Amino acid sequence: MKQTVYIASPESQQIHVWNLNHDGTLTLTQVVDVPGQVQPMVVSPDKRYLYVGVRPEFRVLAYRIAPDDGALTFAAESALPGSPTHISTDHQGRFVFVGSYNAGSVSVTRLEDGLPVEVVDVVEGLDGCHSANITPDNRTLWVPALKQDRICLFTVSDDGYLAAQDPAEVTTVEGAGPRHMVFHPNEQYAYCVNELNSSVDVWELKDPHGNIECVQTLDMMPADFSDTRWAADIHITPDGRHLYACDRTASLITVFSVSEDGSVLTKEGYQSTETQPRGFNVDHSGKYLIAAGQKSHHIAVYEIHGEQGLLTEKGRYAVGQGPMWVVVNAH
């Protein structure tokens, strides 16, 4: 398995393309100049395209991915109704979902043969919308509205239209600020990192039409931490054994182990990382974690090891200015 790492740096308007070697080292293969401040990125389900959101002219760009080395070639673009904060797709590669924090909305862009064509639906009134996350069964879109302490739930029609589910939302504790999410591989649990109080909620997905409840909330931060909490990103290993979340103020990654059924998290430790880690990701083998320092302008690679999933730094690399997003593609 070959793996390629893509790093989005909006301040220098670049995507750095790296080969992830089997020993955890990175080899730079391409630097792409992007026509705008590139932030969120996601790979299409068939691994043929990289979709990126850019500003200040709000668009989604599609880059064709070379199957041999992961190199990028521009393919298409489509306008967006708001500034892109987060980008994702459904599992069939039919739609791109874009959350917009500033617009307080989530939009759906239709894909045709993998290329973005047009916006088919927009839902507004989602103050501080920070991500859009489709469940593994491709039936429910979870959309955190950070400023409202709620996660809105939508069904997605065959034409890409969003309809409020029943229940239409789940709520966090006041002041939590739900931000990013991941799902357990067993499809029974979701994990949401809360930006404003730096906590992680475990949501049990008993039934896509109801009976959804928060079964655990864990504080990410060390007991002696007294500064402003500012959590950012969350990812789980492919085997579902280890979960990671980062805080930008403390510049640390919190390490959790996950119970076999996915219902219980145990905090195992902390890893100091690059300054102001806005984004990170885990590779497809579950062996390496790559974190981006928005203020250090570097990325760091960590090896994941042991039953606890603790991290050991393997190396760090200069990238563009203000790196914010990390995507890993296997090909």
Swiss-Prot record:
Keyword field contains Hydrolase: yes
Modified residues (N6-acetyllysine): 287
Reactions this protein catalyses: 6-phospho-D-glucono-1,5-lactone + H2O = 6-phospho-D-gluconate + H(+)
Name of one Pfam family that matches: Lactonase
Cellular component annotations (GO), alphabetically ordered: cytosol
Pathway: Carbohydrate degradation; pentose phosphate pathway; D-ribulose 5-phosphate from D-glucose 6-phosphate (oxidative stage): step 2/3
Domain of life per record: Bacteria
One of the record's GO molecular function terms: 6-phosphogluconolactonase activity
Keyword check for Acetylation: yes
Assigned EC number: 3.1.1.31
Keywords, ordered alphabetically: Acetylation, Carbohydrate metabolism, Glucose metabolism, Hydrolase
Gene Ontology terms describing biological process: glucose metabolic process; pentose-phosphate shunt, oxidative branch
Disulfide bond sites: none
Family as reported in the entry's similarity comment: Belongs to the cycloisomerase 2 family.
Function, in words: Catalyzes the hydrolysis of 6-phosphogluconolactone to 6-phosphogluconate.
Protein name as it appears in the record: 6-phosphogluconolactonase
Species the sequence originates in: Escherichia fergusonii (strain ATCC 35469 / DSM 13698 / CCUG 18766 / IAM 14443 / JCM 21226 / LMG 7866 / NBRC 102419 / NCTC 12128 / CDC 0568-73)
